[in-house]
Curated annotation (Swiss-Prot):
Alphabetical list of Pfam families matching this protein: CD20
Protein name, entry field: Membrane-spanning 4-domains subfamily A member 10
Transmembrane segments: 57-77, 84-104, 119-139, 169-189
Family membership: Belongs to the MS4A family.
Tissue expression remark: Expressed in thymus, kidney, colon, brain and testis. Expressed also by various hematopoietic and lymphoblastoid cell lines.
Annotated signal peptide: none
Main localization (coarse): membrane
């Protein structure tokens, strides 16, 4: 009885063993590179400086537009019989509109830095530049060429038309300033658009530190032969463990029988 070994052992004795156990040496952890990140450079600082400058230029545009509207409206309301080319062509009206649109386009470009808005800002400021040049020549014609006003402007005993002449001279100064503002704003918006295009094309890429995936293998799955060998080796281990337990139990039973045998014979 002690020499016999069981030939079949039920699987509920030692529990279910994993199929993937003992398939070979453990594979090292796989390293996976994370997505690449952009590296900031000097283009970002230049873009921020350009945005601040563009915002200030837009504010100056809007301020000059309202001042131009105030002085132009007062000039229209006071002039009655005096022939002025600047009023015949309604320059105070369309000049104010062009300056205001250019300033609002610059402020909108700073708030929403999109390529389409930057192009619109450049176009609006170029149109404002041509409007300012046209107004500059119109006012210069009234002040210096046709000569409806007495000269010089600043005289100790001004005539009734002198204050009108001074109002038009104020519009002339605003228009002269608007020429430089429109040109500067158009150039700044164009440079911002160019910097954004260079940023998209020339930004270097640096990969992040590889990330380790512990306990996971990215290699091919094991073959059917390896899985079958692992399963048979686990079944053999279970059978050996069970047979060892049965052998120990039979030995203990045999020893107990030997100890109790003489007692039974004495009785």
């Amino acid at each position: 009885m002690a020499g016999q070994a069981p030939t079949a052992v039920p699987g509920s004795v030692t529990g279910e063993v994993s199929r993937w156990q003992n398939l070979g040496p453990a594979q090292p952890a796989q390293k996976v590179a994370q997505p690449q990140n952009l590296v900031p450079d000097g283009h970002l600082e230049k873009a921020l400086e350009g945005s601040d400058l563009l915002q200030k230029l837009g504010g100056f545009h809007i301020a000059i537009a309202f001042a131009h509207l105030a002085f132009g409206g007062y000039l229209i309301s006071t002039v009655k019989n005096l022939h002025l080319v600047v009023l015949k062509c309604w320059y105070p009206l369309w000049g104010t509109v062009s300056f205001l649109v250019a300033g609002m386009a610059a402020m909108t470009t700073v708030t929403f830095p999109k390529t389409s808005l930057k192009v619109l800002c450049v176009i609006a400021n170029v149109i404002s530049l041509f409007c300012a040049l046209a107004g500059f020549f119109v006012i210069a014609k009234d002040l210096f060429l046709e000569g409806p006003f007495p000269w010089p402007i600043w005289r100790p005993y001004p005539e009734p038309t002198t204050y009108i002449q001074r109002l038009e001279l104020t519009l002339f100064c605003f228009t002269f300033l608007e020429i430089f503002l429109s040109g500067s704003t158009a150039i700044t918006a164009y440079r911002m658009k160019r910097l954004q295009a260079e940023d998209k094309d020339d930004t270097p890429f640096v990969p992040d530190t590889p990330m380790e995936l512990k306990g996971l293998s990215l290699g091919p799955p094991p073959s059917y032969k390896d899985v079958a060998q692992g399963h048979s080796s686990s079944d053999t281990g279970r059978a050996l463990a069970t047979s060892s337990g049965l052998l120990l139990a039979s030995d203990s039973f045999h020893q107990a029988l030997l100890h109790t045998g003489p007692r039974t014979l004495r009785k």
